[in-house]
Design a protein with these regions (language model features):
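Conserved, structured core segments of small domains
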Residues: 1-114
Length: 114
């Protein structure tokens, strides 16, 4: 099963260079890396990445995350995947551009989130 992380293209370049992602500012404050399921992804982007450009969707294989992956209640009581520890670049299964449309909304390409 894949889960997803939204990153800037620059953050992804840093992940590739270092071999792992230790978290964005909010992840570091909360003590875990915030991830989303396909069903949760569009709302996550709307709430937390509105108007941010140069974003990518990183697909992540949950089987490669080990026991640091936990499913915990969050928005509306829905269970969200949280990763306690670093995200290894080797867990990535896909890198998908998330462009901004002329209406100021992110334009999700075809995928499991629709």
């Amino acid at each position: 099963m894949d889960v997803y992380k939204i990153l800037t293209r620059q953050q992804w370049a840093e992940v590739v260079a270092s071999g792992q992602f230790n978290g964005a500012a909010i992840d570091l404050v909360d003590g875990f890396i915030h991830l989303s399921t396909a069903r949760q992804l569009i709302e996550t982007v709307r709430r937390h990445f509105r108007s941010q450009v140069d974003l990518v969707i990183v697909g992540i294989d949950t089987e490669r995350l080990g026991d640091g992956l936990r499913w915990e209640p969050s928005r509306g009581g829905d269970l969200f995947p949280h990763l306690y520890g670093s995200l290894p670049v080797t867990a990535a299964t896909a890198l998908i551009d998330l462009p901004m449309g002329p209406d100021g909304e992110h334009q999700f390409p075809p995928g499991p989130w629709h």
